[in-house]
């Protein structure tokens, strides 16, 4: 599989090779008929537009066809083809990203050409791909005097380096000035400081859902098959009528017109509710909310981040999932906030005021000041990975610990002992025990992924440029969809097992049984694990259920 290829080996891939791998139609073999690919894509765009949603990102077959078209672009299609290359290919280690990275690397090395992409532009575009297959060509370019400054800038803002960090470090120690520049940039946390700080005042329009919002309201279980397709799945958000909510088609399509009317006021929307995020579908629920109320992520198709959620109470795992997406979740009294109100949020002061009158509507305190760093970094996980990169760079350069980032507050010292759970988490963090409220990053030994969340976890793994698991046991099951699979489930049954196993995981097969009964036989005592299922509970050791993105991190 293309996804199995390691960064550092990016052979040029032809459209014919991809067509064979994918069982592509005959048009993909014939360069004179490549315009058929464009026609098919435009047909897909029109079909999705009729549903009110954007097209899917390019897959490997389409990306391979695009490569051939970019080499010899049809007259009048130049801008369209460039936009597809820049904005419609998933980042990370997606198969289409492999084709894109290999093409751009070939241009940078002079192995192929395109009138639309210069070697300098190729390196610049490689720098937008976040991590994975783009890293090795960027590191190689540090030795090219003409391309090195562009590659250094790209790498300075790239977090998903993992073991490739040592390749840059080696070049820096060997005297490469551009590699030294990258190391110094990482050490200075410029990847973080170059991003805008959270604004002193955030003006939003209230989208209020009274009472309790369960994740099933935001990501209905009958529509679970569409969860990986974020724009399509978001159409089902709040599709059932309730107080203050007016679905376009009750039972089928949520309040799209109502959302658009509020957006017409000219401000981003904030999701507001009395109780928000209870239930088990946290990641897909977060995706749906942010699709309407979040910010576009540059160069990343069909996914959004940022956004604001205000809740009288926000369920803990939903809160964490919002953090991971770079959103600002705030627990605050929402009684004075009504649908359609325009409000000003002052995150540093802890105030919510009426935008027109300045009237104080509510006061709050953030759960932790580190939340401000998370929003600036683009999410909790980018912050964790980025801080680690900065720490490694500073250690390599012999510099003291960075003071750029906010630190979690120390918990009060105690002479009391630890419970067994505190000891197990402590062992996973390399200490004797963990006190309530103490920040730690435990090593996950066992990870479970089931089939209704597995495709989303796969997408997260691709985004995180994962080519191998660090957890000792990662298990994927198909216990939710084996009995009555939809067509999309059948496709998942065929493709997900290899994806997991090629990264060192264990994949059950449809009909093998329930994930918990398998996982529980393989657990190690006194270890910590997680699972993409709200009822993940270990009889040995300790587990923390999580959304699809945290499950992808171990």
Q: Language-model features: where?
A:
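Short inter-helical turns and helix N-cap capping residues of alpha-solenoid HEAT/ARM repeat scaffolds
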Residues: 74, 114-115, 143-147, 176
């Amino acid at each position: 599989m293309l996804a199995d290829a390691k960064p550092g080996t990016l052979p040029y891939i032809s459209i014919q090779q991809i067509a064979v791998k994918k069982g592509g139609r005959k048009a993909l073999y014939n360069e004179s008929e490549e315009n058929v690919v464009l026609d098919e894509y435009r047909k897909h765009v029109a079909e999705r537009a009729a549903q009110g949603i954007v097209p899917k990102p390019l897959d490997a077959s389409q990306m391979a066809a695009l490569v051939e078209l970019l080499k010899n672009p049809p007259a009048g299609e130049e801008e369209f083809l460039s936009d597809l290359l820049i904005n419609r290919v998933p980042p990370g280690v997606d198969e289409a990203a492999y084709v894109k990275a290999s093409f751009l690397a070939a241009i940078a090395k002079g192995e192929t050409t395109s009138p639309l992409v210069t070697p300098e532009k190729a390196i610049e575009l490689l720098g937008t791909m976040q991590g994975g297959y783009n890293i090795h060509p960027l590191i190689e370019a540090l030795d090219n005097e003409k391309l090195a400054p562009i590659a250094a800038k790209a790498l300075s803002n790239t977090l998903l380096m993992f073991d490739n960090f040592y390749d840059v470090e080696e070049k820096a120690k060997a005297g490469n000035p551009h590699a030294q520049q990258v190391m110094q940039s990482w050490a200075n946390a410029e990847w973080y400081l170059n991003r805008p700080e959270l604004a002193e005042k955030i003006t939003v329009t209230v989208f209020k859902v009274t009472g309790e919002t369960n994740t099933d309201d935001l990501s209905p279980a009958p529509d679970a098959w569409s969860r990986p397709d974020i724009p399509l799945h978001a159409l089902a958000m709040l599709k059932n009528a309730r107080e203050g909510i007016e679905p376009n088609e009750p039972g089928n399509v949520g309040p799209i017109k109502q959302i658009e009317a509020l957006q017409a006021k000219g401000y981003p929307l904030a999701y507001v509710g009395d109780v928000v995020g209870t239930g088990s579908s946290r990641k897909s629920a977060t995706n749906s909310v942010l699709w309407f109320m979040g910010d576009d992520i540059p160069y990343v198709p069909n996914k959004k981040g940022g956004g604001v959620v205000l809740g009288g109470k926000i369920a803990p795992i939903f809160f964490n999932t919002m953090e991971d997406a770079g959103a600002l979740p705030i627990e605050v009294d929402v009684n004075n906030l009504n649908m359609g109100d325009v409000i000003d949020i002052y995150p540093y002061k802890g105030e919510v005021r009426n935008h027109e009158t300045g009237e104080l509507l509510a006061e709050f305190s953030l759960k932790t000041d580190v939340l401000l760093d998370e929003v600036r970094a683009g999410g909790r996980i980018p912050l964790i990975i980025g801080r680690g990169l900065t720490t490694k760079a500073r250690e390599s350069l012999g510099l003291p610990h960075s003071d750029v980032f906010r630190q979690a507050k120390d918990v009060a010292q105690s002479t009391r002992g630890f419970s067994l759970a505190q000891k197990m988490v402590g062992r996973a963090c390399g200490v004797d025990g963990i006190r309530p409220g103490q920040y730690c990053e435990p090593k996950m030994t066992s990870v479970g992924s089931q089939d209704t969340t597995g495709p989303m976890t796969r997408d997260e793994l691709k985004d995180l440029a994962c080519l191998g698991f660090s957890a000792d046991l990662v298990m994927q099951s198909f216990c939710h969809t084996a009995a009555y699979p939809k067509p999309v489930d059948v496709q998942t049954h065929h493709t997900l097992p290899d994806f997991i196993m090629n990264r060192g995981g264990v994949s059950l097969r449809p009909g093998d049984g329930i994930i918990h009964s398998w996982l529980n036989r393989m657990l190690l005592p006194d270890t910590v694990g997680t699972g993409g299922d709200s009822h993940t509970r270990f009889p040995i050791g300790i587990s923390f259920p999580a959304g699809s993105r945290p499950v992808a991190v171990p």
